[in-house]
Amino acid sequence: ISISPNALRPLQKLGIKDDFVDRSFVPEKAVMHYQGKEIKRLDTEVVTSSRQKLIEVIHQSYVGLGGEILFEHEYKSLDADSCEITFTNNEVYKVSHVLACDGIKSSARQNHFPSSGVPAYSGYSAWRGIGLSEIKDIQFHFGPGTHIVNYPIDHEGRTSFVGVVKTNEATEDSWKIKGSKEAFLEDFKFYDEEIFSMVSSSEDIYKWGIYIRPSLNSMCSKNITLLGDAAHPMVPFLGQGGCMAIEDAYTFGILSGKLGCDFNKVQPLYEKIRLQRNNRIQSASMLQGKLNHIKNPIVAFTRNLLMSHTPLLAMRTEKIWNYSIDEA
C-alpha cells in the first residue's frame, strides 16, 4: 500500500505517523518507463508499506486507548430502526450508530442502500506479490494494455509488485486466489523480466479481478454511515483507495468529537465534506486506468510526450495530496 500526504496528515494528527514511517519505506522518486525507456522522474512524498504494518500501528494505538475488538463475531444483520446488530454467533448488540467499512461487498450497503448498484468487473485484472529486490524508488512500467508498479515496503529489501492487465476475461474479486508465475510471465511477456525480478523470490503470487460500484448520492442512511470501499470502491490507479478510507474515518471522528456525538448533525456535515471528493477521485482513478493501458502506439506516444515534457503529473498529484481535512 502507498500512503500519500493527504492521508499521512491524519496519521500525524493521531500521533501514529512516525511509528508507521519507521516500519515502512520512504522512496524519494517515482520513475515512469515505457517499453524499457525512462520517460519521467518525479519527486514523491508517499510512504510505501504493507497493509499489515498499517493495521498493526492503528490497532496498537486503538487498543492502547482502551478500544475493544470483538473476535469470532461475523456480521449477520442490522436493524436500523431498533439500532441492533446481530451476529452469526447469535449475539445481539444495541448501538447508537453504525460505521460500515466492510469493503466493496458491503452487506450494510447492499441491505440499506438498495438502489446503489452491485459490484461489477472493471475490465482490469491484477497480479500481486512481495519479493526481494534492491530498488529504492517507485517504478512504473507501461506497455500496451498493461502496466507494472514496483516499490520497496521496508528497509530489508521486501518489494511489492503489482501487474495490471486490461482484459474482458473477468477474474474473481478475491485477494486469496493464487496464480502461477508462468501465467504471470505470459501476461507480461513483452517486458524485460529484470523489471519483475522479485517475482522469483515471492513465496506466492495472487491474481484478482478489480471491481467497482456506481458512485453514491448519499453515504448515510438512518443511523448508518459508510466509509472506505463500502462507500466508494475505486480502481487503484491513483493509489487513493486506502487514503480515502483514512480521510473518511478521520473526518467522521473529528466531527463526532466537535459535535458531541450528535450523529444527526455529524452525518450531513460528513457527507458534505466527503461525498464530492470521493466521487471525484473515484472517477479520476478510472480515467487514469485508461491512460495507463493505452494500446494504440500513436496515442501512447502522445501520452508519454505529455508526461515527459509537461507538469501535468505533478499538478494532478499535488491537487490530491495537498488536501487537508482540517481545512475542508
Which residues does each predicted region cover?
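Acidic/histidine metal-binding catalytic segments
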Residues: 23, 190-204, 263-268
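Conserved N-terminal helical subregion
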Residues: 4-130, 168-185, 326-328
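A short coil-to-beta-strand element that immediately follows conserved catalytic motifs
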Residues: 119-124, 136-137, 181-182, 193-208
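Alpha-helical membrane-targeting segments
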Residues: 283, 287-322, 326-328
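Conserved mid-domain beta->alpha element of the FAD-binding
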Residues: 99-100, 127, 150, 184, ...
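Short gly/ser/thr-rich secondary-structure transition/capping motifs
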Residues: 66-67, 81-82, 142-143, 205-214
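Short helix-loop capping/hinge motifs at secondary-structure junctions, enriched
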Residues: 18-19, 39-40, 132-137, 169-170, ...
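Active-site substrate-recognition segment that forms the wall
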Residues: 137-171, 177, 181, 185-190, ...
